[in-house]
C-alpha cells in the first residue's frame, strides 16, 4: 500500500497536508516495511531472474529480508521503512535490529560479498552498502546512494552486483 495514494491517514502519523504535498511532487511513501517490500518485489520480479523473500519467524538473527540472484551474482538485501525522514537529511539513524550489522560483516568477511540495506523514506530511498560497521547505526550522505524511484534502486543493485568479488 502506498501511503500517498491509498491512505486515509489512519495508518500513520503523517499529516494529510504533508502527504498531499509529497504526492503532488511525485514522491512515494509506504506505511510499513511490508508494503515497501511488496512494491520493491513487484519491480524486482520483473527484472531479476530469482528473487526470494527470506524473512520469517524461523530464520536466524540478522539474516536480511531478500535474496537476489543474477547469474553469476547473488545479493542479500535488508529492507527498512522510515517515513519520518528525508533522503536530503545530513545523516540517518537506521533501525537495524541486534545482529543485523554483525551478520552483514560476517558474510562480507567469509564470502567476500557486500549486503545492502534499502531504506524507504518519505521522499525516496537510500541504499546503504554494508561494507563497514556503522557506529550507533548512524549513516551519512557520503555512505549511501539516494534515489527517488524504485527502478533506480534496481539499477544500482544491478550495477553493484557486477562489482562483487567471487573469489
Task: Show which residues each predicted segment covers.
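Conserved catalytic cores of phosphodiester-cleaving nucleases, focusing on short active-site segments
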Residues: 66-68, 72-84
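Cysteine-rich micro-motifs
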Residues: 9
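Acidic-basic catalytic patches of nuclease active cores, encompassing PD-(D/E)XK
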Residues: 3, 12, 16-58
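Charged phosphate-binding loop/patch that engages nucleotide di/tri-phosphates or the phosphate backbone
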Residues: 16, 22-23, 143-167
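Short, electropositive alpha-helical surface patch
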Residues: 127-149
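Beta-rich catalytic cores
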Residues: 62
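Nucleic-acid nuclease catalytic cores
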Residues: 108-135
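Short, charged, amphipathic alpha-helix that recurs within catalytic cores of restriction-modification
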Residues: 89-117
